[in-house]
Amino acid sequence: MASGSRTKHSYHNSSQGQAQSSGTSNMNYKDSISKAIAQYTADARLHAVFEQSGESGKSFDYSQSVKTTTQSVPERQITAYLTKIQRGGHIQPFGCMIAVDEASFRIIAYSENACEMLSLTPQSVPSLDKSEILTVGTDVRTLFTPSSSVLLERAFGAREITLLNPIWIHSKNSGKPFYAILHRVDVGIVIDLEPARTEDPALSIAGAVQSQKLAVRAISHLQSLPGGDIKLLCDTVVESVRELTGYDRVMVYKFHEDEHGEVVAESKRSDLEPYIGLHYPATDIPQASRFLFKQNRVRMIVDCHATPVRVTQDESLMQPLCLVGSTLRAPHGCHAQYMANMGSIASLTLAVIINGNDEEAVGGGRNSMRLWGLVVGHHTSVRSIPFPLRYACEFLMQAFGLQLNMELQLASQLSEKHVLRTQTLLCDMLLRDSPPGIVTQSPSIMDLVKCDGAALYYQRKYYPLGVTPTEAQIKDIVEWLLAYHGDSTGLSTDSLADAGYPGAASLGDAVCGMAVAYITSKDFLFWFRSHTAKEIKWGGAKHHPEDKDDGQRMHPRSSFKAFLEVVKSRSSPWENAEMDAIHSLQLILRDSFKDAEASNSKAIVHALGEMELQGIDELSSVAREMVRLIETATAPIFGVDVNGRINGWNEKVVELTGLSAEEAKGKSLVHDLLYKESQESAEKLLYNALRGVEGKNVEIKLRTFGAEQVEKAVFLVVNACSSRDYTNSIVGVSFVGQDVTGEKIVMDKFIHIQGDYKAIVHSPNPLIPPIFASDENTSCSEWNTAMEKLSGWSREEIVGKMLVGEIFGSCCRLKGPDAMTKFMIVLHNAIGGQDTDKFPFSFFDRNGKYVQALLTANKRVNMEGDTIGAFCFIQIASPELQQALRVQRQQEKKCYSQMKELAYICQEVKSPLNGIRFTNSLLEATNLTEYQKQYLETSAACERQMSKIIRDVDLENIEDGSLTLEKEDFFLGSVIDAVVSQVMLLLREKGVQLIRDIPEEIKTLTVHGDQVRIQQVLADFLLNMVRYAPSPDGWVEIQLRPSMMPISDGATVVHIELRIICPGEGLPPELVQDMFHSSRWVTQEGLGLSMCRKMLKLMNGEIQYIRESERCYFMIILDLPMTRKGPKSVG
């Protein structure tokens, strides 16, 4: 309801609002449904007041009526309101309407102006000639010419009748042409008849195609705009619609989450007052009207002053005829008066539909779409535009909706990234500092969601930020929350007054809205918003002294005034995404505020290991399946490393190119294996894939090798997939292709008119792809044998029909209007000379089988070079390619799942680590023996190592050598103790002895370097050697040989040579291969060793693995500067 407050609670039911779990999307969806239902009640109330206000609504006080819409409305009144809107029984007089029983063609209803428009004789007028009579029961076919009747019969038999609109028919008596626009209703078929402006049907078709071309040009302009700017997109679409239609003013209305509207873009005649920035209450566009816009996406009112024409219908019909889908439906009197008051005589309204929520999409179809807003044209005089141009505008709106949807998704993703980053920084702040830091430092909790102020109430202390209540007021709010919402986990409202807070008046307009998250029973986080009106400004004309009834008349000014009244003492509502962000932070903070126990860390570390091992096994299974598939596939598959050199080359590529896998490996894909004309597109494809942007349906031209392959070329259509390792780092690119060499040769000949045209098109040769052609008016002029086989429709049934709507739409069904819009754009672009290559195109064949293909559309020229239409070629993906893509998606899904799990573990392990650090700090303050201090230092060193590993989980910096080292002074002996402590449990389990051959002076030797990274590297090498030492009764030895080397300025470098030795065979060969040579690791341990080797190299160290007859060992060499004084004490 426009004037209702929005108060949400988590797991709490109160008189002020509905119980709701904040952060639950399904509840958010239900909440939006409840708002819409409440809005229906408000709309019905306004409608009843208007109906009772007398003739023409002169005594109807609009602003006052909006205020009183909270009053309850009887159910019968709502039913009457909806009936009036949907079954009003009147049409606009610029056309006429006939409703027909579908089975018998018998007329069941007609508008009273139909006789005059069709030059017919009314039943009440006696006539001596054989003029046709219009009455209930007349066969509609007798009113039109024989050829028109045939068209109507064909349309009645269509599955999707609206796709054939408009049908060009002629009145039998007068010969006048009409656009017949047909749609099905519950009792039959409604035929809207709009007078056409030309006598020649061919000109009508050409005019419709010209309208589509104009729309395509506007769509191309939209698609060329830079991304990330919704305002620019809206500004462009109003300019395009105004240019197409010629209306004096065109606006974009956006519906906000609370159902109220705003003008966000406008293009107008210079002398008209601006409406940009105008906000209006939700009741200005009733929910019933919004429902109608989803059903009938284009609505034209030609003259708001025109007297509506009554519809006469068969008395046997149970209720008035449904006019929801009619292009002629008369406007409601309330809306007509509003238009007249604002000086707008004619209007055109175009619905902007985008994808809805996941919950909305469960039912599929239209239910998964959401009305985002409207594009509306106003004109100061009577104006009518023909149906083909309106149809073209609908295509433009579908393209606008697609583009807008992508921009909204991008904006949502950017917002989510911002929220996640802010949450991470806030949590990190909590781990390092005291809780008040999330308010006093930057970023603060104000950066999480849009607000005017925020506060933390922690341990009975108040930490405010921005516009907030006083400390006394916040304590009062806390007492109110505990008293009335004590069993809740949070509350959000746009009006504290409506939520029932008794002290709301004392807060004034500064604090109207509040969101609160309960961290503990005594600790709270608050966000505050001021009243909405301070943010709302309209650039329209101010109240004119002569407009004495300005507040009462229905007019944009009174709408704006009513809106300001509705939002008085109210903030902008808290959006679902904002509440999700607050709820997520609340969950994280709850855990962070609890005392962490050391045992927690053990459980989490154990869980991390278990999850990693399980994930590795699952990924290995997928990887083995991929390898088997690649080796046996009949589709060409190959791969390159990060340098673009071949590292995979399956048998199918060998067969096509004549180049063996051994010869191909190591060659540059771009420079050694591709023709020059493919190099630029391949380089771009490779560049993007190595940065995570995968390409699809790119054509490349491969060279061939061997005596029999001279001067031949292989054409492949490839998908480039980024190859990633376990850490999600990109290590190369895989290409899955389809051989289209045969089709390419045919197409080249075809486009250049080489050879026998008919023989090529209709050849049964399997190399000839499915082909269809269009003339300049998008009518099908060719449909070859392969296309007949693919679609199930014969050439005789298809040729001559319109490709957009009639063929692809009615015969070959497409998935939704968006698919038809995209196909129309491709087709018109080709006719206009802009070719499209490998466009994803899917449809249902005659038997309902779903066909997935790639569409290539090229312009079609005659011998003189003039464009006469378009050629379209269909390529079907091979089963092997489809299977490869399915396995790829499975692998990507598994990798993404592992990434989420790893991110979760990295986040959750921070709290127990913080607990370990806190426990260590407490122990330091007690009286400890020297041995206990040494144990404590070792524990602290291991904790710092684990923290750094978790914090720097991105391995890309290690791979490319850009890792930042954090150097400090430290005891070398402390590092050795920490390293040894990490393998002691494994030594005991395996029964392996550790031998330490380390000079005593090492314990007190101080050096300068990255202590934690050195510790991490040495621990990993030692752990792997212990893991593969013979057991039981085996041994592992650590030998450390330091030597001092003086350098300039009197400084000294400690040259360290450390050996980790074990008897027997030592590490498995694949582990050593992973460590030193492979860019694609096979084992989990191999990845760790490879990273440690690269970290050691970053610290100017080196490692060798040496295998002798009876033993093997790591030899690690590292130079570290020696310091003159010891390091600061640990902790």
Curated annotation (Swiss-Prot):
Chain spans, region Disordered: 1-26
GO molecular function: phosphorelay sensor kinase activity; photoreceptor activity; protein homodimerization activity
Biased composition (Low complexity): 14-25
One Pfam family this sequence matches: HisKA
Residue intervals of the PAS domain: 622-693, 756-808
GO cellular component: nucleus
Span of domain Histidine kinase: 904-1124
Binding site for phytochromobilin: C334
Biased composition (Basic residues): 1-11
InterPro entries the UniProt entry points to: GAF (IPR003018), GAF-like_dom_sf (IPR029016), HATPase_C_sf (IPR036890), His_kinase_dom (IPR005467), HisK_dim/P_dom (IPR003661), HisK_dim/P_sf (IPR036097), PAS (IPR000014), PAS-like_dom_sf (IPR035965)
Domain GAF residues, every copy: 229-408
Keyword Transcription regulation: yes
Family: Belongs to the phytochrome family.
PANTHER family (alphabetical): OS08G0260000 PROTEIN, PHYTOCHROME 1
Stated name of the protein: Phytochrome B1
Source organism per UniProt: Solanum lycopersicum (Tomato)
Organismal lineage: Eukaryota, Viridiplantae, Streptophyta, Embryophyta, Tracheophyta
